[in-house]
């Protein structure tokens, strides 16, 4: 809802509607910030798909996640220093992200991938069902490695 309201506010030509929408965004922001402090989770206004599960605290998501992704805790998903909204990770559906895994930059993770605990992902993995691990992250099984 937050993303929708931001889009609605930015595209509105009616000043009153725009101010009302801005007020709604502020209320949602307050609720979100209180919940973030309580649960130790930060999800920025990008896109989280349906059924996303966060198993343990300390998760920061600043990117796009598909449906049914699992975060096991202490995860950082975000952009590099640029701060551009387009330089964020795009994670497919049904991706399992292990404890302490970090995904940084404008990378794409295909559907049904598994990212191992502590992996640092800085490049794209476009083969569905790939198991990814290591620092820097590498494919450790899948179609390419048999």
PLM-predicted stretches and their roles:
Residues 1-39, 137, 143-146:
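Terminal amphipathic alpha-helical/low-complexity segments used for targeting or macromolecular assembly
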Residues 39, 44-45, 49-51, 55-56, ...:
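Left-handed beta-helix
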